[in-house]
Amino acid sequence: MYKLVLIRHGESTWNLDNRFTGWTDVDLTETGIAQAKNSGQLLKAEGYDFDLAYTSVLKRATRTLWHVLDEMDQTWLPVEHSWRLNERHYGDLQGLNKAETAKKFGDEQVLVWRRSYDTPPPPLAANDPRSERSDRRYANLLPGQVPLTECLKDTVERVLPFWNEAMAPAIKAGKRIVVAAHGNSIRALVKYLDNISDSDIVGLNIPNGIPLVYELDENLKPLRSYYLGDSEAAAKAAAAVGAQGKAVAA
């Protein structure tokens, strides 16, 4: 049996402000740092030990990973960064407050933009200063690989090659891996692993800073999955994520 540990980054400054973040490179809040440290403490207390770590190229995920590994006394661990693990790109919504956007366009439309499988938000203009196409960290990518918007389907299509070419072979080689990423890049992996339908994925929310453990068979098919720590607290945190895009907070 293999194990895979997935951690959504701790609370970011734009999570706190209830803004659409996407590829915008915002930092963790003090709460987010505490969540990341708590994840590391949970993993250490449960006897987890890793050989390899993966994260995105966005600081809220990379710093979450660092705090996790620091609490585990494993900051020396090899870490591979990949843009393919970045958050889903939210296009022209990036930087906007989710509740205010829902008041303007309606809860239903914002839910479609946030959680539907194949409907992207309105794109950024190519010359929009919020675009990442001139960012050095993406200099080796083809222009079309740096998105102006994405739906979850697009996110799945960029995450799965990294799973197939890097993560899955490492797991099968016996490497114990931890992944610190983002709500939608983790949703993409969970959709694939659990074979969740395009319609059912709408209801899946990933809470900040709580380790999600997958136990996998020899073919990397899930035997079971669970959040470490207080399962009721994890469920409440996931429900809170789902309520972020409503005009009136739930």
Curated annotation (Swiss-Prot):
Ranges for region Disordered: 116-135
Pathway recorded for this protein: Carbohydrate degradation; glycolysis; pyruvate from D-glyceraldehyde 3-phosphate: step 3/5
UniProt cross-references to SMART domains, sorted A to Z: PGAM
Keywords: Gluconeogenesis, Glycolysis, Isomerase
Catalytic reaction(s) noted: (2R)-2-phosphoglycerate = (2R)-3-phosphoglycerate
Catalytic residues, chain numbering: 9 (tele-phosphohistidine intermediate), 87 (proton donor/acceptor)
SUPFAM superfamilies according to UniProt: Phosphoglycerate mutase-like (SSF53254)
Keyword Isomerase appears in the UniProt entry: yes
Residues engaged in binding substrate: 8-15, 21-22, 60, 87-90, 98, 114-115, 183-184
Entries under InterPro entries matching the protein: His_Pase_superF_clade-1, His_PPase_superfam, PG/BPGM_mutase_AS, Phosphogly_mut1
GO biological process: gluconeogenesis; glycolytic process
Pfam family, one: His_Phos_1
GO molecular function: phosphoglycerate mutase activity
Quaternary structure and partners: Homodimer.
Name this polypeptide is given: 2,3-bisphosphoglycerate-dependent phosphoglycerate mutase
